């Protein structure tokens, strides 16, 4: 399990967009998710980091 952080570019936002976090099974899945978002013509997304996490950490993050 990995946690990945990405930046969504929005021209109307003061800082040019916002940072968000999502989860995936593997690094490749995280990269594919971001690539799919960009291919769908949504707001541009830049992958910032991918961090391996334990199932327990995922559960803590997801619940809170």
Q: Where in the sequence are the language-model features?
A:
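Short aromatic-glycine-(Arg/Gly/Cys) micro-motifs in beta-strand/loop hairpins
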Residues: 1-18
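Compositionally biased, low-complexity intrinsically disordered regions
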Residues: 3, 28, 45-48
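Compositionally biased, low-structure terminal segments
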Residues: 5-8, 24, 59
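Generic structural motif
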Residues: 9-13, 27, 50-55
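A short, exposed loop/beta-hairpin motif centered on an aromatic-Gly-Thr core
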Residues: 15-28
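Short, mixed-charge low-complexity intrinsically disordered segments
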Residues: 36-64
């Amino acid at each position: 399990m990995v946690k990945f952080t990405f930046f969504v570019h929005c021209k109307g936002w003061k800082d040019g967009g916002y940072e968000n976090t999502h989860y995936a099974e593997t690094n490749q899945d995280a990269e594919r998710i971001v690539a799919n978002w960009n291919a769908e013509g949504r707001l541009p997304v830049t992958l910032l980091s991918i961090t391996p996490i334990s199932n327990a950490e995922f559960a803590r993050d997801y619940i809170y």
